[in-house]
């Protein structure tokens, strides 16, 4: 009897928690295609035959099937309602009791959010005035024409205190610094999708100052960051500075109001190899666009090879922020204790560019034993994507087999998952930047699998990850700013907070639920609503652990959504 009573109490408590945000129906708030299966998830209560779906013409549909699912993370009961393919474009009204919401069905449901996620990079450009940003126009900040060489980066020909110019580039995340590791990784990840879908990007207009030239807007945007990266290589030895930074994070102020001195710090093997990889790729991909960027491909190729030589001579030059003094530096570290994955990516990119045997040998020596989703701390999959893009390449079969092993394991739990998606079914799916590294990048891997097989078997699972991202999840949030009915309004992003505009920059992917809650003591009155892994998210400006934005996270969103949009 006691056990029964306890079970009843827990069940009632769970239902009360589920109803806290007032929505029982969880669905993709952005939209879906008339060629894909749709589903909604009902929190707590079996909808039975009460769920109604009204088509654009007024016809009433019922769910084709209803499946009970119990969350392995919270124990909460949910009901996955399969609606099947909704073949007519328009708005479908979903009702359950007094609750109603809309499912948007269109031929290109992800076009707007994909474009916004790429255009975000224009809005966060450093060193120029933003004049084509509409409400988000702002004066120039951080010209970075007066940057000091930190003593950690000093060399005989560039001693500490040397003034260099290092303009342009993108602000990295919620802060105003620029980091080579993350910048190079972000470009490399987006290049991977560009190589697969170049025709799509050739037609994509993001309304930026360069839109009238002969180069795709996507490549123009990458060039704005590449121009900065070129300045981060020491011209005397080929090593690359780890980052351009202030000693401490700026406050929540606009770029024009920032006053701290900025430095380039310590040359590192990881930054140098990431630089080498992305410059080698850029040399190839910009070759057809000499009219707009004369001489760039040759310059990038030469600088990539020089960087690689420096890395071979300095294989243990890892970033050690705790050793930096006069001044000490406390901004983002992007530290790494292994360069095996960076050597693999850089050697792969340089082999594709030059065909030199030494690079093939190095790629083979540093090749991964299994596929992992791409992150700035493990870039091996960027090398894998390069081998997959090259027909008949030396390591293509090995990389393909590793990818297929990963993808087949990723989809194993979908049939019983609470939100009908490969992502979000275990605690390890959640943490810092999880929506990028584990959702978007997992989906990107699934799309690559179909590309390799010439099928659409895995695309349906990638679409399910998009459903999760856009609202069919435990919090009911669409995790991209400016889209959906319920999206983040207070991201940890300095210009969005300081610009006196109510809405944040659109098209930003936030980090997502993070049970680590590393910022819980810094929330200044805000609080996480739950310790449950998939509910541990708070839409508060102070939440850098769950609500920050970053270029690498948006790069994963661009890579994923542009691929989806290109194949709709």
Residues covered by each model-derived region:
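Positively charged n-region of N-terminal signal peptides that target proteins for export
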Residues: 1-4
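Hydrophobic h-region of N-terminal signal peptides that target proteins for export
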Residues: 9-18
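Short, compositionally biased P/S/T/A/G/V-rich stretches that sit at domain boundaries
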Residues: 20-30
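Aromatic (Trp/Tyr) and acidic
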Residues: 29-97, 101, 107, 123-188, ...
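Acidic, glycine-anchored loop motifs typical of Ca2+
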Residues: 210, 214
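Carboxylate/His-rich catalytic cores and anion/metal-binding grooves
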Residues: 216-237
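Proline-centered turn/helix-capping motifs that create local helix->coil transitions or kinks
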Residues: 233-242, 315-321, 355, 415-416
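Solenoid-like repeat scaffolds
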Residues: 367-373
């Amino acid at each position: 009897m006691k056990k029964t009573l306890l079970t009843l109490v827990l069940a009632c408590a769970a239902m009360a928690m589920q109803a806290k945000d007032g929505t029982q129906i969880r669905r993709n708030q952005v939209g879906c295609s008339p060629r894909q299966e749709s589903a909604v998830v009902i929190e707590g209560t079996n909808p039975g035959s009460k769920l109604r779906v009204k088509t654009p013409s007024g016809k009433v549909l019922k769910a084709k099937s209803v499946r009970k699912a119990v969350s392995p993370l919270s124990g909460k009961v949910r009901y996955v309602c399969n609606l099947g393919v909704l073949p007519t474009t328009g708005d479908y009204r979903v009702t359950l009791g007094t609750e109603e919401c809309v499912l948007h069905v269109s031929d290109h449901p992800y076009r707007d959010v994909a474009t916004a996620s790429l255009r975000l990079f224009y809005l966060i450009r450093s060193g120029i005035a933003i004049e084509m940003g509409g409400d988000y126009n702002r004066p120039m900040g951080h010209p970075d024409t007066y940057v000091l060489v930190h003593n950690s980066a000093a060399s005989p020909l560039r001693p500490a205190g040397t003034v260099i110019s290092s303009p342009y580039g993108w602000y990295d995340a919620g802060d105003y610094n620029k980091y080579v590791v993350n910048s190079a990784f972000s470009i490399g990840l987006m290049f991977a999708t560009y190589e697969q879908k170049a025709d799509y990007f050739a037609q994509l207009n993001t309304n930026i100052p360069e839109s009238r030239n002969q180069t795709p807007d996507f490549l123009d945007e990458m060039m704005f960051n590449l121009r900065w990266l070129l300045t981060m290589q020491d011209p005397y030895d080929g090593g690359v500075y780890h980052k351009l930074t202030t000693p401490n994070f700026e406050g929540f102020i606009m770029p024009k109001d920032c006053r701290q001195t900025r430095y380039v710090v310590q040359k590192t093997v990881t930054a140098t190899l990431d630089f080498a990889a992305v410059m080698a790729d850029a040399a190839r991909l910009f070759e057809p666009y000499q009219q707009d960027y004369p001489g760039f491909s040759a310059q990038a190729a030469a600088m990539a090879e020089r960087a690689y030589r420096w890395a071979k001579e300095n294989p243990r030059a890892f970033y050690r922020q705790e050793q930096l003094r006069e001044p000490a530096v406390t901004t983002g570290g992007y530290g790494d204790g292994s360069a095996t994955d960076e050597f693999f990516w850089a050697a792969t990119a340089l082999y594709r560019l030059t065909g030199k045997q030494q690079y093939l040998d190095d790629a083979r020596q540093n090749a991964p034993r299994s596929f992992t989703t791409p992150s700035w701390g493990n870039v091996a999959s960027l090398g894998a994507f390069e081998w997959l893009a090259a027909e008949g390449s030396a390591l293509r079969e090995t990389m393909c087999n590793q990818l297929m092993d990963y993808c087949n394991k990723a989809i194993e739990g979908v049939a019983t998952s609470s939100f009908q998606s490969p992502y979000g079914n275990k605690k390890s799916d959640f943490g810092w930047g999880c929506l990028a590294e584990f959702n978007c990048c997992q989906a990107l891997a699934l799309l690559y699998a179909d590309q390799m097989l010439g099928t659409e078997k895995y695309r349906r699972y990638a679409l399910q990850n998009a459903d999760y991202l856009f609202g069919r999840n435990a919090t009911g949030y669409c995790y991209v700013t400016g889209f959906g009915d319920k999206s983040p309004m207070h991201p940890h992003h300095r210009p969005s907070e300081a610009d006196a505009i109510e809405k944040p920059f659109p098209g930003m992917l936030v980090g997502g639920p993070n049970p680590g809650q590393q910022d819980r003591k810094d929330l200044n009155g805000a609080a996480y609503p739950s310790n449950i892994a998939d509910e541990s998210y708070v839409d508060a400006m102070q939440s850098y652990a769950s609500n920050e934005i970053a270029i690498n996270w948006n790069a994963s969103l661009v890579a994923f959504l542009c691929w989806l949009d290109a194949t709709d």
